[in-house]
Amino acid sequence: MTDTLAAALGRIRPDVRAMHAYAVQPATGVLKMDAMENPFPLPPELQEALGRRLGALALNRYPGARLTDLKSALAAHIGMPEGFSMVLGNGSDEIITLLALACARPGTGERAAMLAPMPGFVMYPMSAQLQGLDFVAVPLTADFELDEPAMLAAIAQHRPAITYLAYPNNPTATLWDEGAVQRVIDAAGAQGGIVVMDEAYQPFASRTWLDRMRAEPVRNAHVLLMRTLSKFGLAGVRLGYLAGPAALVDEIEKVRPPYNVSVLNCEAALFALEHARVFAAQAAELRAVRTRLVAALRAMPGIERVWDSEANMVLVRVPDAARAFEGMKARKVLVKNVSTMHPLLARCLRLTVGSEADNAQMLDALQASL
């Protein structure tokens, strides 16, 4: 290493240099059941129609008015309440970054805090670290429910600027008790904090917090709703969105980079919303398939526990997660070994809910690998 390269590396923050880049497991030639992707491709006639739409775009121009059209289409799709506004992101990951950026307090001598139940989505603590917020992790119960007393105590102690509640949660696929969630929201609001309801997996859940936001707008005036089109069926189209009271959302809009959503992503999302019934039918099929998958897992000898699911994933506990993961990988099935992510996830694997054929192959590989 040259002196100049070493000196240049010294300019990189020590905490960043100590990190590991997010690794995507190689998936060539394997059944990919590790990332909660929709297993169904677009029907051929829709593929052709989308290709024509994308081919006609003016790629030499920056994104423009079609982003306004997309916001309007998304607002209609979710039934966005009056007085709400929306921010678009290059995936919900970017939305999480924008929220942290907007709430950080650099140069003030006062560090803002972000709080979330754990185990949860890895981007919450990562965004807090990178944007200079303190991250407060509150463990779930052993059954992956909200520990309400612990949450209320942590909120009172740390007064978080942002509290994330994944609804349903990843990687546990749990949808927490409405009353407990509302009391956590109330507590965060009493401390002047923002609550973000992360509904990435809403197409597979039995309820949405948006209903409570409509029914009790004053009580939920500090609540923002975050969703993504990834689980809608467009993981390859990076598009997330944040909706909530305009006074809050418009402040987040100020830190959004210009042109962060490409014309290709925008047009693909608009096309998908025009054919929302196709994706709704796919989600309904996956919910039905999930019921059969959970039953098959609970009947499988050697499985220690299978948790109920409100998402397109199922969490299972096995005698040896590392051995089962490697055995399945050797059998060309890739799942997510989450056993080292958090002590509560000991010996756990996270399985994607796929098509009937995919699930059958995954079950065979799991049974042979226990």
Curated annotation (Swiss-Prot):
Residues with the N6-(pyridoxal phosphate)lysine modification: K231
Cofactors (names): pyridoxal 5'-phosphate
Swiss-Prot/TrEMBL keywords: Amino-acid biosynthesis, Aminotransferase, Histidine biosynthesis, Pyridoxal phosphate, Transferase
Catalytic activity: L-histidinol phosphate + 2-oxoglutarate = 3-(imidazol-4-yl)-2-oxopropyl phosphate + L-glutamate
EC class of the enzyme, as a word: transferase
Highest rank taxon of the organism: Bacteria
Pfam families tied to this protein: Aminotran_1_2
Family listed: Belongs to the class-II pyridoxal-phosphate-dependent aminotransferase family. Histidinol-phosphate aminotransferase subfamily.
Record protein name field: Histidinol-phosphate aminotransferase
